[in-house]
Amino acid sequence: MGRGRHDTLAPVNHPAGARELAGGSSVSLVANASSAEVVAVKDGEASTPNAETACPEYTPTPLFAFDVQGARVTVWPAQPSGNARNRAGEGGEEDDDGDANRYTRDNHIGGSCGRDGIDCDNRIGDDGNCLNHIVYLHVYDGDGLDVLSECQRIGCPPFTLVAIKPACWNDDLTPWKCPGLFADDVPFAGRAQDQLRLLEEEIIPQVERECGKPNSPRICRTVAGYSLAGLFATWTALNSSAFSRIASASGSLWYPDFAHFATETPLACPIDCAYFSLGSKEAKTPSRLLRNVATGTDEVVAAFRSKGVPTQFESNPGNHFKEPALRMARGITWAISQQATNR
């Protein structure tokens, strides 16, 4: 593991709203002024039938960031809707390139703060529907902008992203000790319980205290992650009442005894939905442990369905390292788009 194999996964970072095409052409993402549709701009020309109505490009700016017990936490505002982008792009003396970002900083959550606690009832509005979403995403490296950019590109509903880079990826996200994947790899320390405590007692209260507004609608929390962070997200649903949704993309569900644990352990709290995905070639590996990932994922998916959780499984082409940000974005998009069932 400590040598760049499988779970030592570095995210694919793309500049916000920009991609490089073959031949050096640039593609930027803009919002269609008549809808929330995202369209491509190649070499300065919008590829949309009504290019003159396109809005200025939206580039997210973090709300704030902080360090806690070796973890780095970066909080991104909810993406503005098409109407918000339009308002930000309208002419006027006060308009400038930062209007879209300022709009989201002023209206980032509209949700509750840490004073309300983090139990099961702190996730839905009076009508039983989620009104504001916060996604807590553990990342191997970076600040989560690559995933946020993909979410915007594929039309994900607005949400506040909390990207958490743990102090030690291999140790902090694993539920119990396990030998390394290969003979010369360092064992996994199994400190997920400590990371969950940090999340519940330090990170969530601080984030929602900074973002929250008194007497505003309640929020839905999703815990999400790729690879070992996907394992952690799945394990969290069985150990914490803080979250109503999980999104595990290419999760390390090969982890020894985890599928059995997921089958035999009741949910810590009823949850609205669970998302799992796996690459079609992920089980094709020299590692004996990693070869169990497909079987383990199937068993975990079946376990969540048997608990009455609306569960989605998606198979993606390729191995563990293909398009991780896009895979994670697809999971987040599905999870926060579902109807609240935990009434």
Regions found by a protein language model. Give the residues of each.
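Active-site nucleophile loop of the alpha/beta-hydrolase fold
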Residues: P166, A247-Y255, K281
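Alpha-helical scaffolding within the catalytic cores
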Residues: S149, L231-F232, P256-C269
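A domain-start/cap signature at the N-terminus of enzymes
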Residues: G2-G89, E93-D97, N101-D106, G110-N132, ...
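Serine-hydrolase catalytic machinery in alpha/beta-hydrolase-like enzymes
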Residues: H133-L198, E202-K213
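Alpha/beta-hydrolase fold nucleophile elbow
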Residues: K213-G225
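C-terminal catalytic histidine-bearing segment of alpha/beta-hydrolase fold enzymes
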Residues: S277-S280, A294-V301, R305-R343
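Conserved hydrolase catalytic core segment
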Residues: W235-S244
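Gly/Ala-rich beta-loop-alpha elbow adjacent to hydrolase catalytic centers
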Residues: A224-A229, A233
